Regions:
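A structural motif
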Residues: 16, 273-275
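Substrate-binding/active-site clefts of carbohydrate-active enzymes
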Residues: 198-261, 265-268, 272, 286-303
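Acidic/aromatic-lined carbohydrate-recognition and catalytic surfaces
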Residues: 1-219, 254-255
Length: 303
């Protein structure tokens, strides 16, 4: 929606060949949301807060009373778009998410349902894992609070499987949100190309993910164990060094699997963009690993 118009305006007014945006990786399902786009819960999926409900095909066919509810939720926060103060993403999402839930519950025609099923099949088990993490987050609470489910339960835990069965509608809603987000980012990219951009959207890949996020929980074997995080050594910018609090990929796992998880992540980003900027691109060759509790100054480069 808004991204689509932004790209079209940029193409017409600046004659630019591309527009670089901040990372649009997936965040938490409910507020409070992480304000930094460089600390996502998953780099494999999209940030659904960018969805524009009015651009979803089913919005146009909503029953009048349901559409009125969606519009009322929009109007409750729309005026803030014209204010000069920083946007309150939590307030916006608290209005947008129930509006999206109303559209989801209204259903789809057979053609659209088949498209949704195709998306789920193509996205594969990683989509199911992400939707499961979102469900656990919403029902059991944020994993960085007093809730211990992140550490005590794996994705194959019987309690997790039971939770998905009991709240399958919410599980399905989280998969649906990813489908809609992918459709709308694709539409934005096509809009940019149609208006003359050569590359269109340039996505930004964050250097890592939240240590308690979906990627780290669902597939711990992909990450280094022992509480290791990545950052950078002391320099003129920060003489103490920096600890970004993000677990690095396990290089042995990557090598043993032919870097499949990384290749799939890059491929998924190129599905919605003409180019990808890799934040801290030298991280492809080396990363500053920091042992838990020792501080950034006592880290070391791992290749």
């Amino acid at each position: 929606g808004d991204l689509k118009r932004l790209l079209a305006d940029a193409a017409e007014k600046s004659k630019a060949d591309f527009m670089l945006i901040n990372p649009i990786h997936a965040g938490a399902p409910i507020p409070p949301l992480e304000p930094s786009p460089y600390l996502p819960e998953s780099r494999r999926f999209l940030n659904v807060t960018y969805i524009r409900p009015q651009d979803i095909p089913e919005y146009a066919t909503l029953p009048a009373d349901v559409r009125a509810q969606v519009d009322a939720l929009h109007d409750s926060v729309a005026a803030r778009n014209d204010e000069s103060t920083p946007m309150d993403i939590n307030a916006a999402w608290e209005a947008k998410r129930p509006a999206l839930r109303l559209i989801f519950e209204a259903g789809r025609n057979n053609k659209r349902e088949l498209e949704f099923e195709h998306f789920k099949t193509t996205a594969g088990p990683d989509l199911d894992s992400f939707a499961t993490w979102c469900l656990c987050f919403e029902v059991w609470g944020a994993p960085w609070g007093e809730n211990r489910w992140f550490f005590e339960k794996t994705i194959d835990d019987p309690a997790v499987r039971q939770l998905v069965e009991e709240h399958h509608d919410l599980f399905e809603f989280n998969r649906w949100l990813q489908w809609i987000a992918a459709e709308q980012v694709n539409a934005a990219q096509q809009e940019a190309l149609d208006h003359g951009m050569t590359l269109g959207l340039m996505q930004d890949m964050a250097v890592g993910v939240h240590g308690l996020g979906a990627d780290a929980w669902a597939n711990p074997e992909r990450f280094a164990s022992g509480g290791v995080t990545v950052g950078c050594p002391p320099d003129f910018y920060n003489q103490q060094g920096q600890d970004w609090g993000q677990p690095p990929f396990n290089p042995r796992y990557l090598e043993a699997t032919g870097y499949q998880v990384y290749r799939e992540m890059v491929h998924s980003m190129y599905e919605h963009a003409g180019a990808v900027r890799i934040d801290h691109v030298l991280g492809l060759f080396r990363l500053w690993w920091i042992p838990q509790g020792l501080g950034a100054r006592n880290g070391a480069y791992v290749t």
